[in-house]
């Protein structure tokens, strides 16, 4: 099963995240199947590849709770 989850990047105390599609059996920072976005919680910036996200969701990918909250704030589920 494929999930949309956050992959941590950045320095100590300054996290940034990439939103990735990854198999559930892989670790958090493992090899991603596809990178579909970027999230910076300190600057509250989000960059999303909406067509790729919608395609993955149609093919059965499940977002984690945090990623689904980010997608709702960006208005992806309204499209």
UniProtKB/Swiss-Prot annotation:
InterPro entries hit by this protein: Ribosomal_bS16, Ribosomal_bS16_CS, Ribosomal_bS16_dom_sf
GO molecular function (one): structural constituent of ribosome
Cell compartment(s), UniProt: Plastid, Chloroplast
Top-level taxon of origin: Eukaryota
One Pfam family here: Ribosomal_S16
Cellular component terms per the entry's GO annotation: chloroplast; mitochondrion; small ribosomal subunit
Transmembrane segments: none
SUPFAM superfamilies given in the database record: Ribosomal protein S16
Protein keywords: Chloroplast, Plastid, Ribonucleoprotein, Ribosomal protein
Swiss-Prot/TrEMBL GO biological process terms: mitochondrial translation
Family membership noted in the UniProt record: Belongs to the bacterial ribosomal protein bS16 family.
Cited NCBIfam families: S16
Protein name (database record): Small ribosomal subunit protein bS16c
Organism (species): Staurastrum punctulatum
Taxonomic classification: Eukaryota, Viridiplantae, Streptophyta, Zygnematophyceae, Zygnematophycidae
